[in-house]
Amino acid sequence: MEEQIIISLGSNLGDRLNALYKALALLEAYPISIKLLSKVYETPAWGFKGEPFYNACVSIKTKLKPKDLLEVLLKVEKTMGRLPSKGKGYSSRTIDLDLLFYKSKNIFSAKLKVPHPKLHKRNFVLAPLCEIAPKFIHPILFQTIEELFQNSSDRIIATPLTYDLGLPPIFKSFPYIVIEGNIGVGKTTLAKLLAVNYNSKLLSESFTKNPFLEAFY
């Protein structure tokens, strides 16, 4: 079984979906690459009264050590305007990023506990987690994520939504997107892929009007 590094994302303030997109983009500004993305799930606030959350889980690849990865998560939260919690208990937040698993490591320190000590009690984590890592074995409880979800005592229902976190809503801001570059580097392939994924019209250049094609081919 491939070991995974898994992060959970949650937001219940402002534009919740955009917050998830933005958090992923900010994470990839660091030496982090996204491997797997779950669907977006909507769930009621857990442990306090507040607006519903959008939640998701992501499997990543990184050479960052656990403590350094935690620092990145905290930096992203701060960049997105998350304020430090006042007092004990849970509260609404623009973005919430938690390190659920770092491969099969068991980490217990004042600042970081991995696996996340409460993930097996929370359906808003287990539902998206089960989607991307159903057979991953919890290194302390020795059950798969699938088994933990099936045996969960949490009665909260996590409702899957149709949003695709792998496809940011770029056409909301740009009615047209132009792809430029050297001949033969894959512009047309990329443009066709975007057109298919976003169900958009592809406007290809005219080969007869491109003076550089003859010299290239």
Q: Across the structure, where does each feature detected by a protein language model lie?
A:
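Extreme N-terminal starter segment of soluble prokaryotic enzymes
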Residues: E2-I7, F174-Y176
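Short, surface-exposed acidic-centric catalytic microdomains
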Residues: A19-P66
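Flexible, gly/pro- and Lys/Arg-enriched active-site loops
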Residues: G47-F53, K67-L70, K75-K172
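Hydrophobic anchor at the beta1->P-loop junction of P-loop NTPases
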Residues: I179
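P-loop (Walker A) phosphate-binding loop of NTP-binding proteins
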Residues: N182
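Conserved lysine of the Walker
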Residues: K187
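Hydrophobic positions on the alpha1 helix immediately C-terminal to the Walker A/P-loop
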Residues: L190, L194
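Conserved substrate/cofactor phosphate-moiety recognition/catalytic segment
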Residues: A195-Y217
